[in-house]
Amino acid sequence: LTCLTKMVECIQLPLDVEDSSDTLCC
């Protein structure tokens, strides 16, 4: 569930850097 919570924050972040987002999400 921690991953899902971080994913929400990830979605809020700029989608310009999708690769970095995925890493930060999980």
UniProtKB/Swiss-Prot annotation:
Expressed by the venom duct. One of its GO terms (molecular function) is toxin activity. The keyword Disulfide bond applies. Signal peptide: none annotated. It is found in: Secreted. GO terms for cellular component: extracellular region. The keyword Secreted applies. Keywords: Disulfide bond, Ion channel impairing toxin, Neurotoxin, Secreted, Toxin. Contains 2 disulfide bonds. Acts as a neurotoxin by inhibiting an ion channel. The cysteine framework is C-CC-C. This is Turripeptide OL57. It comes from Iotyrris olangoensis.
